[in-house]
UniProtKB/Swiss-Prot annotation:
Belongs to the ArgR family. It is found in: Cytoplasm. This is Arginine repressor. GO terms for biological process: L-arginine biosynthetic process; protein complex oligomerization; regulation of arginine biosynthetic process. The gene is argR.
Amino acid sequence: MTSADRRRDAVARIIRARRIGTQEELLAALERAGFRATQATLSRDLARLGARRVSGPEGAVYELGADGADGGLAALRGLVSSIAANASMVVIRTHPGSAPAIARAIDLAQPPEVLGTIAGDDTIFVAPAGELRPRRLAARLAELLGTPSALAGDGGERTH
């Protein structure tokens, strides 16, 4: 195992063990664990580990990307406020600051029903692939994100 691999393992252990909100906090924890790194090196390590900052009720913290096929969607459950669909797209409302992480997780999961996502701070536009009806896609996303589905037919109802 190289020194870079050992450092990345330490970064992963620290993120799993503690609530780390900034790279400065993480650099300090790494130094206490006996590792030296620059902010640029740490930033590359975080990207390689699939770490991301996720906003939650207690502020933004780093989380590691999921190893599963869902692209990390399971870790983001509870951050979705609602899912709605119209005739052409799906709109997901999230807690403030959570939309980019959720959109990335959807993209990484690569559900065949999704052509692509566009995320703002708390809103995600999801374009359905092919001829798939957006309301059916909304129901599938509600299932993936662990959000109860209230969609029925083509009425455009919301899920909460």
